[in-house]
Amino acid sequence: MYNYVNETWQKMWKEKSEGIKEKAIAWRKGPTIVRIERPSRIDKARRLGYKAKQGFVVVRVRVGRGGMRKSRPKAGRRPKHLGTVKIKADVSAREVAERRASEKYPNLKVLNSYFVYKDGKYAWYEVILLDLSHPAIADEFRHLRT
């Protein structure tokens, strides 16, 4: 069944369907980090360890696209050596999304994350978080405790 869900999602993504565009417009207007009731891509979430039970939390995170922005140095130098453009981050947008979600929810642990959608300005990821103190999942994910 999840194979069909995956095929449908791929078809929507390739055809740039109106449904997903409308969702993206709503996501763009909303806050950066949003807790959602259930994953948008259930097939991907299940593959990465999500289960529909208490203690699992799914969060959609919006990350800006493009290169890093670095402030212009105050001291004089030739423009070529300013070091303000063409700077790449050492972390991926997915890692940035996971870090932001874990900062917003400090009592939860990041299990995994996956890509949802991107447009010209933003990329959206859904991050699966775990409440390790919840009795429903405490024994199953005991190895994640620090």
Which residues does each PLM region occupy?
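Ribosome-associated RNA-binding proteins
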Residues: 1-146
